[in-house]
A protein has these predicted regions:
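The Walker A/P-loop phosphate-binding site
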Residues: 4-123
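Conserved inter-motif catalytic segment of the P-loop NTP-binding fold
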Residues: 88-187
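Preference for well-ordered, secondary-structure-rich cores of eukaryotic proteins
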Residues: 36-42, 63-64, 69, 147-152, ...
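Conserved NTP-handling cores and scaffolds of large molecular machines
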Residues: 81, 110-117, 185, 208-211, ...
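Phosphate-binding/switch region of NTP-binding enzymes
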Residues: 194-198, 202-281
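Intrinsically disordered, low-complexity regulatory regions enriched in Ser/Pro/Gly/Thr
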Residues: 50, 85-88, 136-137, 208, ...
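Hydrophobic/aromatic beta-strand patches that form the interior of the parallel beta-sheet core
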Residues: 56-58, 93-95, 143-145, 216, ...
């Protein structure tokens, strides 16, 4: 499956001199309106979204499922919206800094989504070949940038507009994780992680807002129970993942400006399964 992915080498990314770009209002409106919708990306977490340009943070302790949840969202993003699969049929960029992301796991999640779909009689997927073809075609929607140091990461963030211009179907920017080079960047200058992330998001938002692209990033929180902070204006959804003490269960705290919800979940080989309290329905 790896041959069907699009890898962007950092060395191929160049900083180009700024050139004036002339675009009519009609052209701008067309470019923004043609962007695929991310509605249905993860219905349990985003009942009416996420909207394009939203910022979504996935935080949590080690082994709480941060990269797994991100992979599940990427699978939904790049899968088609036909065959009753209800994918977003959108392209996505993954900036891979921690190198915890596994292609094999993404393919497994995509296969699981297809297998569990309630397929209508007229659109039935009859053979394994058809499922494999769908997965291979969908993987072409994912652009992966492997990053190995803070200088490469900075270069990538400042040249995102070139990548967005080359593919108008890109609706999602994923970063795993945004804090991978925190210590490299801040070894000579004491900066809090929140301040560091805020600085990076400012750079990211300048380009994602222009091109109508949502952002999802992961970050490690070692002391999640002691790190309760108010949602900032830069983040639209804050997702905190945590393992319940002396248990195999997990709990997700979802925070927006309007609400704070706690959702229990389990991590299975075929994806994260949410356990919704019937009183919330």
């Amino acid at each position: 499956m790896k041959n069907f992915l699009i890898y962007i080498r950092v060395h191929d990314i160049q900083i180009k001199p700024m050139q004036p770009q002339i675009e009519s209002g009609a052209e701008l409106l067309t470019r923004l309106n043609e962007k695929p919708s991310l509605h249905g990306l993860e219905d349990t977490l985003f009942s009416e979204g996420p909207q394009n340009t939203d910022i979504i943070e996935i935080g949590g302790e080690r082994s709480s499922g941060k990269t797994f949840l991100l992979s599940q969202m990427l699978a939904k993003c790049i899968l088609p919206n036909n065959y009753a699969i209800k994918g977003c049929n959108a392209s996505a960029i993954l900036i891979n800094t921690d190198h915890h992301f596994q292609i094999s796991k993404l393919v497994e999640l995509m296969s699981s989504i297809i297998n569990t779909v309630n397929i209508s009689f007229s659109e039935a997927i009859d053979t394994e070949f058809d499922k494999t073809t769908i997965i291979k075609d969908s993987l072409r929607n994912l652009h992966i940038i492997d990053c190995y140091n803070n200088e490469q990461f900075s270069l990538i963030l400042r040249t995102l507009d070139d990548i967005f211009l080359d593919n108008t179907k890109i609706a999602l920017l994923a970063i795993d994780s945004i804090t991978a080079y925190y210590w490299q960047d801040c070894e000579d200058n004491i900066t809090t992680i929140d301040t560091y992330i805020k600085k990076l998001l400012k750079i990211i938002k300048l380009q994602t807002t222009r091109f109508n692209v949502a952002t999802i990033y992961t970050k490690l929180c070692e002391n999640i129970h002691n790190e309760r902070k108010c949602l900032t204006n830069n983040i639209d959804y804050k997702i905190q993942l945590c393992k319940v003490c002396n248990s195999t269960n997990f709990i997700c705290t979802l925070e927006t400006i309007q609400i704070i919800r706690k959702i229990h979940y389990s991590i299975l080989s075929n994806g994260i399964k949410w356990k919704i309290d019937e009183t919330e329905r």
